[in-house]
Amino acid sequence: MIKHIVSPFRTNFVGISKSVLSRMIHHKVTIIGSGPAAHTAAIYLARAEMKPTLYEGMMANGIAAGGQLTTTTDIENFPGFPESLSGSELMERMRKQSAKFGTNIITETVSKVDLSSKPFRLWTEFNEDAEPVTTDAIILATGASAKRMHLPGEETYWQQGISACAVCDGAVPIFRNKPLAVIGGGDSACEEAEFLTKYASKVYILVRKDHFRASVIMQRRIEKNPNIIVLFNTVALEAKGDGKLLNMLRIKNTKSNVENDLEVNGLFYAIGHSPATDIVKGQVDEEETGYIKTVPGSSLTSVPGFFAAGDVQDSRYRQAVTSAGSGCIAALDAERYLSAQE
């Protein structure tokens, strides 16, 4: 169970009003997020004696503290763990390591950030009318959530046959030598389908329209792969199974309106992700896709002192290990920035 960890200086103000206490809170560096990027940044900054504060949120981005990784049942590709472990277990270990080195972890959700002046200001959920907390630097590591279809049966079989990451989950035993399906019409869908052919008996790609949005080169690769079957003008209607694992997908041809049951043991969504950037919207440069724009090879953004790490700025890889590396980069960038301000 995740506990609320508060640094000692936050417990010595008994009797002081909430508004006065709020005015007194200033952090040298603040990390917003609770996934691999956030905790890796916290570990590096804490070991460098930068006294980081990490706001892990209550239900940030619709996910409990720990981020998207907590929805993954088995992780087999994170270095150092030859025996697979769950996403929740991995994040609990990272959290303990952050706390061990002195990170001030606060289980509150940051709901508003003001980057217009220094120090930066932030407010937490249910405290928007209070005096803001101030901070000299911010690392935003709020991640991105996979877009879901919300099909009937989806909640029952989420991570029990339904996933939004083929690279993360495609190799697990329940998918090996089984028919699988991918929903999407872009490059991501084609890439995931091609990846899944390493493990599946065959892979269906369900495309809503009568053509791909994918690049020509990706389309050619799909056409040449004998283990991939493309179903154009096709939508999914319902996920079915035995109550434990997915084994069927109800589909419909949008031209003929004919419905059928498609036998599949895995369904992968490849319809995009939504980066959690609402709290800084309009204050920092973003890519056209909504991801925070960073200087290549760094976590630097258009606002000095404001850094972005993990999936909130990575629209391509979105892996736990790449997020962790990004968190390390952000910590080093923030440390250099703060040292230069002294």
UniProtKB/Swiss-Prot annotation:
It catalyses: [thioredoxin]-dithiol + NADP(+) = [thioredoxin]-disulfide + NADPH + H(+). InterPro entries: FAD/NAD-bd_sf, FAD/NAD-binding_dom, Ferredoxin-NADP_redctase_2, Pyr_nucl-diS_OxRdtase_2_AS, Thioredox_Rdtase. Residues 1-23 form a transit peptide. It comes from the Eukaryota. GO terms for biological process: cell redox homeostasis; cellular response to oxidative stress; removal of superoxide radicals. It is found in: Mitochondrion. GO terms for cellular component: cytosol; mitochondrion. Its cofactor is FAD. The keyword Ribonucleoprotein does not apply. Disulfide bonds join C165-C168. FAD binds at residues 34-37, 56-68, 77, 110, 168, 311-320. Binds 1 FAD per subunit. Keywords: Disulfide bond, FAD, Flavoprotein, Mitochondrion, NADP, Oxidoreductase, Redox-active center, Transit peptide. Its EC number is 1.8.1.9. GO terms for molecular function: thioredoxin-disulfide reductase (NADPH) activity. It holds the Pfam family Pyr_redox_2. Belongs to the class-II pyridine nucleotide-disulfide oxidoreductase family. Homodimer. Present with 414 molecules/cell in log phase SD medium. Acts on mitochondrial thioredoxin 3. Implicated in the defense against oxidative stress. This is Thioredoxin reductase 2, mitochondrial. It comes from Saccharomyces cerevisiae (strain ATCC 204508 / S288c). The gene is TRR2.
